[in-house]
């Protein structure tokens, strides 16, 4: 079995994707610790994480786990209450591991590995051309009516403004920021394509979950004095921050 590294605060970093799939970026191959962390997440937020689809991302490890370790991790995550459905695309070793495990690779994660590869030499400088006019930003999306339980609303490449409520079990997602002028009882995911500068603004905060660029916080982690208040949510050093609006 591969060696264990216990220098991390968490063995696995869980981030929420825009289509309800979580990405578990494995930081250390400590299988019992990874499984226990996932079990605790499911216990704390069963409606959010119970039977959630999870992608395993081994890209941050110095070596790919062997087959026995990977199988033990998949079995343990199943027992913890989630459903490992794929591996994040990576090296040829991860490709082989996915075949041995009988799970697919998710091509969505291909770019993050390819960007780390050695870049080809730059082309010779060309004659300077006048810069084209800056493209106008995409107009924000506005939702005038309530977003009800089971509904999902996605604002692609723009901000999202909801003039009514977001009910429990509903999900609003934006590549930009999210502004909610009613009560937020469901989930709000801003910066869905990885924008860490996105924010969430809400007049009446009871969210099941808020996330920015995949980093999330559930209601149980929110101080009681912020519930029912007008708040803003932002990301600071990969940590979700929530504060009341003056």
From Swiss-Prot:
InterPro entries reported in the protein's UniProt record: CAP/MinC_C (IPR016098), MinC (IPR013033), MinC_C_sf (IPR036145), MinC_N (IPR007874), Septum_form_inhib_MinC_C (IPR005526)
Pfam families named among the record's database cross-references: MinC_C (PF03775), MinC_N (PF05209)
GO biological process terms on file: cell morphogenesis; division septum assembly; regulation of cell division; regulation of cell septum assembly
Region (Disordered): 116-140
SUPFAM superfamilies, per database record: Cell-division inhibitor MinC, C-terminal domain (SSF63848)
Alphabetically ordered keywords of this record: Cell cycle, Cell division, Septation
Segments traversing the membrane: none
Top-level taxon: Bacteria
Stretches with biased composition (Pro residues): 119-136
Family: Belongs to the MinC family.
NCBIfam families recorded: minC (TIGR01222)
Self-association and partners: Interacts with MinD and FtsZ.
PANTHER family linked to this entry: SEPTUM SITE-DETERMINING PROTEIN MINC
Function, in words: Cell division inhibitor that blocks the formation of polar Z ring septums. Rapidly oscillates between the poles of the cell to destabilize FtsZ filaments that have formed before they mature into polar Z rings. Prevents FtsZ polymerization.
UniProt name for this protein: Probable septum site-determining protein MinC
Origin species: Xanthomonas oryzae pv. oryzae (strain MAFF 311018)
């Amino acid at each position: 079995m591969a060696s264990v590294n216990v220098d991390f605060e968490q063995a696995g970093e869980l981030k929420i994707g825009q289509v309800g799939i979580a990405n578990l970026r494995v930081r250390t191959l400590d299988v019992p610790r990874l499984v226990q962390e996932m079990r605790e997440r499911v216990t704390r937020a069963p409606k959010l994480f119970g039977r959630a689809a999870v992608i395993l991302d081994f890209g941050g490890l110095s070596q790919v786990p062997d087959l026995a370790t990977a199988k033990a991790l998949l079995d343990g995550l199943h027992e913890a209450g989630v459903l490992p459905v794929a591996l994040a695309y990576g090296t040829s070793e991860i490709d082989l591991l996915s075949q041995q495990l009988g799970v697919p690779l998710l091509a969505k994660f291909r770019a993050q590995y390819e960007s780390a590869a050695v870049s080809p030499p730059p082309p010779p400088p060309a004659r300077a051309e006048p810069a084209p006019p800056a493209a106008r930003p995409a107009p924000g999306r506005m939702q005038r009516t309530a977003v009800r339980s089971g509904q999902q609303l996605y604002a692609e490449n723009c901000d999202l403004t909801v003039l009514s409520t977001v009910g429990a079990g509903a999900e609003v997602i934006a590549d930009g920021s999210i502004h909610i002028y009613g009560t937020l009882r469901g989930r709000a995911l801003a910066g869905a394509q990885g924008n860490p500068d996105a924010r969430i603004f809400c007049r009446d905060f009871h969210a099941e979950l808020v996330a920015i660029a995949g980093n999330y916080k559930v209601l149980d982690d929110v101080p009681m004095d912020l519930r029912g208040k007008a708040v803003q949510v932002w990301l600071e050093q990969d940590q979700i921050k929530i504060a009341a609006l003056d």
